[in-house]
Amino acid sequence: MFRIVAVPEFSIQTVDARDPSSSEAAETLAALREKLSPRGDLVSPRGRELTLKVFGKALSPIEVVETICKDVQSQGTEALLRYTKSLDGAELTADTLRVPEEDLKAAHAVADPKLIETIGRIRDNIATFQSAILHRDVTITPRPGVSLTQRYVPIPRVGICVPGGAAAYPSTVMMTAIPAQVAGVDEIAVVAPPTPFGAYNTDMLATCHELGIKEVYRCGGAQAVAAMAYGCDALPAVDKIVGPGNLFVALAKKHVFGTVDIDSFAGPSEVIVIADESANAAFVASDLLAQAEHSPGSAILITWDESLLTSVQAELSRQLGELERGDLARDALSDFGALVLARDADHACELTDSFAPEHLQIETREPESLIAKIRHSGAAFLGHHTPVALGDYAAGPSHVLPTGGTCRWAAGLSANSFLRSGSVTQFDQSALSAIAQDVITVAEKEGLTAHARSISIRTE
C-alpha cells in the first residue's frame, strides 16, 4: 500500500550522447563514471564530526581505518569494545558482544511466521542455484601413469558483514550465508552493528537462527572487520570476510586483505537500465528508484527512444511521491542518476560496458541479443518482468556484487567464492621417465641443478 509523501522537486541530468563528436556528453559521462569509482575520500559532514570527536583530529577515512585496524590488532577485544562504544554508542563487554543463542531462539519464536516461511522458500532457491554451479573435483589421465586432479576444499571459517544503519537486511544474511553453507563452510560468524536495525533486530536474528547460524556479534564498522581478520578473545579470526558495508567497512576489508581473503571492494549500489520503445515507462522508473532508494545509489537509463526518456522522467517525478524513502531516492537521482540518449542499441551496449555496472537490466523486445554484446556487468536481468529486486531477494544468484566499474575484472559472490582450489599430481615411474628429460632441460637452463637432480636420481 503506497502513501503519498511530500517530496521536493527533483532534478536528474539528461545526456544526449548521440553525437560522437560531442565533448560535453563525453565529459558528463566521464564525470559520472568517476563519481561511481571506488573512492577513499568521500565522507559525510556527520562522519567528519565523529572522526574529530573520537580521534581528536581530522583524519581521512583511510587514516581512520588504519588507526582502528592497528589498535584492534595490537589491543584485541579492548580496542574492539572501545571503538564500538565511541563510534556506535554501545557499551558492551566481552560477554555481551556475542548474541546469546537464547536470544537467537527468542527472536525466531516471535518472528512473523510469514517471514520464516519466506526464508525457507528463498533458501531453497538460493541453494538450488548455488549447488548447480558449485565446482566439483576434476581428474584427468592425459596419458598412462599420469593422474592430474583439480580439487576444491571449502574455506574453514568465514565472517559475514551485515549492515544495520538505516535499515535491517536479513536478505544479506541469506545471500552470503547460504552460498557458504552450500560450499561446505564449517563455521560462519556474522557481525552487525549494535543498532535496532543490526544485531538487535528481530528479523535479522530470526533469519540467522533459521539458517542455523550460531555466531552473531554486536559490532560493525572497521573495528569488526579488523577483529575478524586478526582475531581476539571475544571474536576468533576468520579466513575470509564477505558482505557489504559503508565506506569504512570497504576500506577496512581492503586494508586486511592478505591477512584474510575478502569478496570485493564495494561502493554505492548501481543499476543501468537499457530500454527501447517496447518498455513500460512506469516499470523502468520503478527499477531506477529501487536502486536510488539505497541512497547513495546510482540509477542510469540508456535508451535510443526519446519519447521513452521523457515518459520515464515524468514517471520518476510521480512515483517519488509514493515512496517513504522518496527524499533519499530524490537526492541519489540528483547526485548519481542520469537519463542517457544513445544513438542505437549497439551504442547503448558500448556505453554500458564503459560503466561496467553492478546491475544491468535490459527491458527491450529482444534482450538476449543485447546481453550477448555486453561483457561487463555483475548481474544481468532480462525482459520486462525481471526486475533487479528479484535478484536482490529471491532468484538464486547472490546479490553481493562488485561495484564502481570493478565488474571489468571482479565477479559476484557465489558458493565458489568459499572454495579453495588446489591441484593433485601423481606419476608412476614409467610416466616420470617419459617426461624426465624435458624437466631436466628447463631446470638446468634456469640453473636449478637440484631440481634437475630430483628428477634424474629417480630415472638413472
UniProtKB/Swiss-Prot annotation:
Catalyzed reactions per annotation: L-histidinol + 2 NAD(+) + H2O = L-histidine + 2 NADH + 3 H(+)
InterPro entries, sorted: Ald_DH/histidinol_DH, Histidinol_DH_CS, Histidinol_DH_monofunct, Hstdl_DH
Binding site residues for Zn(2+): 291, 294, 392, 451
Keyword tRNA-binding: no
Cofactor: Zn(2+)
GO cellular component entries: cytoplasm; cytosol
GO biological process: L-histidine biosynthetic process
Annotated cofactor note: Binds 1 zinc ion per subunit.
Binding site residues for substrate: 269, 291, 294, 359, 392, 446, 451
Pathway per the UniProt entry: Amino-acid biosynthesis; L-histidine biosynthesis; L-histidine from 5-phospho-alpha-D-ribose 1-diphosphate: step 9/9
Domain of life per record: Bacteria
Pfam families listed in its UniProt record: Histidinol_dh (PF00815)
EC category name: oxidoreductase
GO molecular function (one): zinc ion binding
Keyword match Zinc: yes
Assigned keywords, A-Z: Amino-acid biosynthesis, Histidine biosynthesis, Metal-binding, NAD, Oxidoreductase, Zinc
Active site, UniProt feature: 358-359
Recorded family membership: Belongs to the histidinol dehydrogenase family.
Function: Catalyzes the sequential NAD-dependent oxidations of L-histidinol to L-histidinaldehyde and then to L-histidine.
Name of protein: Histidinol dehydrogenase
Species name: Rhodopirellula baltica (strain DSM 10527 / NCIMB 13988 / SH1)
Lineage, top ranks: Bacteria, Pseudomonadati, Planctomycetota, Planctomycetia, Pirellulales
Name of the coding gene: hisD
